[in-house]
C-alpha cells in the first residue's frame, strides 16, 4: 500500500518543525491524517483566459475540504501569447512551458503534496501543467477556465462573428478604414476565457478530455456560463476520491500515467486531427508523452494523419463556427462519438470519472444520451455581454446542433474532408518532419511550387510582407526561429495574418523552423526539423531556390541538387563558431533564454530539454 506523500511532513516527532509551519497555515491535529491536495491555479490579470480564475481555486479548495482532504493553493505564471506576439516577448512563450512544469514539480515535491487539481486555460499553461502531472504521476484532475465567447459586430448590414485574428488582419489591411478596424478591435474579444476559436488553448483543453484527465465539457463549455461552475465543484470532490483510491486501496488506475496511456494519446491526436486543432498541440503532446515515458512520436502522428478525416471545422479555418458552436454540437464527446462510430478510437481507455470510452459516450454523447441534464448542459450558450466574470450568465441555445450532415460536427459520411486537419510532411530540408494545419489550407494550394524568399527573423519577414517585397507565388522562409535558434520558437501569427492583409493568403506559402499560433491558417508549414540552429538543411536554402509542397502526398522538397546542398553545407561549416547562426540579425537574448536554448531540442522532439546533456 503506498504511503501518503504528505506523511513525510506531518508524521513523526522529527517533523515537529514542519507541523508547526503547517499549523501556521491553518491546519489542525485532525488534518494531519488527511491527504494534502495542491490546487494549482494560474490566475493573472495579464491574460483574459486567466483573469477570472482568482476565486476558482477557493471554490475547488472548499470542495476538497468538504470531501475530507486538505487543500493548499499556489499559482503558476501565465504568458498571453497574443499580447506577447510580434515582438521580443514571444521569445519567452514556449520556454514558459518548461518553467511552469518545473514550478509545479518544485512546489508539489518540496511540500510532499499527495495529488493535484490543475486550473489552467491558455496556450502554455495547460501543456506545462500536463507535463508536470505526468512527470510526478500523482492523482490529478484538470479543469480549465473555459473558452471566450465569440465576438460579434455589424459590418455591411450583417452581423458577423469575430475573434482575435480578425482584429490582427484588419488592423494591418490598408484597405480597411480606421473606424472599421477600431470597431473590430473593440468587438473581437468580448469576455474572459481562452480566445474563441480552435486555437492552441482550446485545442489543448479539448485534448485533456480525450486523454481522460478532465471531465466532459471541459474543452468547450464557455467561461462565462453558470454551468461551468459544476466542473470546478466536481473536480474538488472527485480528486479526493481518486487520491484515496490510490493511497488507501492501492488502485494505480487512479494515476495519470495509467489514464493517459499510449492508447489515450493516440485518441487525443486522432481528435486533434479530426477537429483541425492547433499545430502547437503536436509539440505539446510529444513533450507530454516523454514525461509519461510513452513511446509516442512524429511517426505515430503521421500514421494517424493519413487515416483520420476532418469532422469539425472551427475558426480560424472558418468564421462560421467558434467554440460555443462546438459545444452546442456536443463538444469533444460529440466528436469522439463520431470517431468511435467510424472505428477510429481505442476503446479500452478510462477517464478521471472512472468511465470507459463506451460508458462516457453512452452518458455524454448528445447523439446517444437519454440524460436531459447532459443535453441541457450542451445547450449552454453565449450571452453577448462584455464581462471578466466567470459563471456570469445562463443563456441557452433553443436546441442542440445534432445535424451531422451539415452542422458544426460531421459524421464520417459527411466529413469536411477525408484527410484530417493536420499533416506531417517530410523532405530534403525537413528530414525529421514538419507540420501543416491542412484544415486551414485552401484546396487550390494543396500543391504549391514557388521561389524562396529567405529571412532570418520574423521581424524581417514582416517588414518585407508589409513593404510589398513578397508577391504572389513566393515561398516565404523564416529560419533561425526554432527552439534553439530563436531562442524560444516564436509563433508566426503576424506574418501569416499580414499575408492575408496584403491579399496573399491563398497566393503564398510560409515555411519556418518556428511555430504558428493556433490562430494561423493558410499554407503555413512549421516545426521544420532539424531546425537551422541545429544544422538543419533549412539553413541552406537561398533566395530564388524553388520549393515544392505536396500536401496530398505528404512531401516538401527543395529543388536543389544533393551536390549543391553538400557544397552549401561545407561553406556553412567553414564559418566556424558562427556556423548555423543568422548572418544579419541583431537580437538581445537574455541569460535565461540562453540557458533554455542550450538544452532545447528541435520540434520533432517536442522542443523539450535534451536530457543527454544533463547525463540523464
UniProtKB/Swiss-Prot annotation:
The modification N6-carboxylysine is found at residue 124. Its cofactor is [2Fe-2S] cluster; Mg(2+). The keyword Amino-acid biosynthesis applies. GO terms for cellular component: cytosol. One of its GO terms (biological process) is isoleucine biosynthetic process. [2Fe-2S] cluster binds at residues 122, 195. One of its GO terms (molecular function) is 2 iron, 2 sulfur cluster binding. Binds 1 [2Fe-2S] cluster per subunit. This cluster acts as a Lewis acid cofactor. Mg(2+) binds at residues 81, 123-124, 491. Belongs to the IlvD/Edd family. Homodimer. Functions in the biosynthesis of branched-chain amino acids. Catalyzes the dehydration of (2R,3R)-2,3-dihydroxy-3-methylpentanoate (2,3-dihydroxy-3-methylvalerate) into 2-oxo-3-methylpentanoate (2-oxo-3-methylvalerate) and of (2R)-2,3-dihydroxy-3-methylbutanoate (2,3-dihydroxyisovalerate) into 2-oxo-3-methylbutanoate (2-oxoisovalerate), the penultimate precursor to L-isoleucine and L-valine, respectively. This is Dihydroxy-acid dehydratase. It comes from Escherichia coli O139:H28 (strain E24377A / ETEC).
